[in-house]
C-alpha cells in the first residue's frame, strides 16, 4: 500500500514539473525582435500634454490616440499597444524550427532550436519563433515579428501516467515499450515474458526515474 501511495505522489510531482516548465516560460517577460523598419521611439508625454494645448491640439492628440501602424510615432496614452507586447493568447506562433544541433544555421537565421527536450526548466533550450497577430486584434507596429523565450519542447500522444499503467499491468508483454515507439525492444520483451519478470520491474523503475522516454524525443504530454 505504501508503494502505491509513493507512486501516486511521484506521478503528481512529475505532472507538476511538466506544467511548471510551460508556466515559467509563459510568465517570463517576452523579448521581441521586430522585423522590417524599426518602430520609432516613444513620443514624450510632456510634448502631448503641454500647457498650451488648445482645441486644435486636442483633436490632433485624439487622432494620434488611434495609434495605427500608419502613424509616424507611437502614442503611449492611446488605446493600442505595441504588437510585440501582446500576450501569447493573441498571437499565432509557428512551432520552433529544429536545426538539429547545427549552430551555423541557427546563427544565420537568428531563430530556431539546436535541440529539443529536457526535464527541468534549466535543461530546456529557449529560442525565437515567428509570430503573427490575429486578424481581429488591433495593435501598433509590425504584426509579424520574432518572439523570444519559447521553450524547445515537443508534445505528442505520449502520456506518462498511461505509459506507467501499461508498464505495471502489461509490462511483461512489452506494452510499455510498444507505447513508447520502441518496437524492437518491445518484441524482445514480449518473447521473454518481460525478461522472466526482471526486465518488467526494471522498466517500471526506469519510467519512474525519468530514464525511459519516448523514442521520438518528445516530452511527456501534460495536457489531457
Curated annotation (Swiss-Prot):
It is found in: Membrane. Glycans are attached at residues 102, 142. This protein is named 'amaretto' after the sweet almond flavoured Italian liqueur because of phenotypic and molecular similarities with TM2 domain-containing protein almondex. The gene is amrt. One of its GO terms (cellular component) is plasma membrane. Residues 1-18 form the signal peptide. The chain crosses the membrane at residues 155-175, 190-210. Pfam families: TM2. Disruption phenotype: Viable but females are sterile. Reduced adult lifespan. No morphological defects of the eye, wing, notum or leg. Eggs produced by mutant mothers fail to hatch and embryos display neural hyperplasia. Keywords: Glycoprotein, Membrane, Signal, Transmembrane, Transmembrane helix. Belongs to the TM2 family. Residues 19-154, 211-224 are extracellular. Residues 157-205 form the TM2 domain. Residues 176-189 are cytoplasmic. GO terms for biological process: positive regulation of Notch signaling pathway. This is TM2 domain-containing protein amaretto. InterPro entries: TM2, TM2D1-3-like. It is a multi-pass membrane protein. PANTHER family: BETA-AMYLOID BINDING PROTEIN-RELATED, TM2 DOMAIN-CONTAINING PROTEIN 2. Positive regulator of Notch signaling. Maternal neurogenic factor involved in Notch signaling-dependent neuroectodermal specification during early embryogenesis. Functions cooperatively with amx/TM2D3 and bisc/TM2D1.
Amino acid at each position: 500500500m505504501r508503494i502505491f501511495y509513493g507512486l501516486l505522489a511521484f506521478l503528481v510531482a512529475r505532472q507538476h514539473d511538466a506544467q511548471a516548465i510551460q508556466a515559467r516560460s509563459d510568465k517570463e517577460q517576452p523579448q521581441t525582435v521586430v522585423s522590417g523598419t524599426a518602430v520609432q521611439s516613444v513620443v514624450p508625454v510632456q510634448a502631448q500634454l503641454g500647457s498650451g494645448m488648445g482645441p486644435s491640439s486636442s483633436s490632433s492628440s485624439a487622432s494620434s490616440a488611434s495609434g495605427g501602424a500608419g502613424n509616424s510615432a507611437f502614442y503611449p496614452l492611446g488605446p493600442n499597444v505595441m504588437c510585440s507586447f501582446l500576450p501569447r493568447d493573441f498571437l499565432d506562433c509557428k512551432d520552433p524550427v529544429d536545426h538539429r544541433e547545427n549552430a551555423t544555421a541557427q546563427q544565420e537565421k537568428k531563430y530556431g532550436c539546436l535541440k529539443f527536450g529536457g526535464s527541468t526548466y534549466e535543461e530546456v533550450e529557449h529560442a525565437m519563433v515567428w509570430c503573427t497577430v490575429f486578424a481581429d486584434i488591433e495593435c501598433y507596429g509590425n504584426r509579424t515579428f520574432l518572439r523570444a523565450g519559447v521553450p524547445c519542447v515537443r508534445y505528442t500522444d505520449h502520456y506518462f501516467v498511461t505509459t506507467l499503467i501499461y508498464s505495471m499491468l502489461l509490462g511483461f508483454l512489452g506494452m510499455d515499450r510498444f507505447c513508447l515507439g520502441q518496437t524492437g525492444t518491445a518484441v524482445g520483451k514480449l518473447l521473454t515474458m518481460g525478461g522472466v519478470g526482471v526486465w518488467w520491474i526494471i522498466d517500471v523503475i526506469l519510467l519512474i526515474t525519468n530514464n525511459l522516454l519516448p523514442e521520438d524525443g518528445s516530452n511527456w504530454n501534460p495536457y489531457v
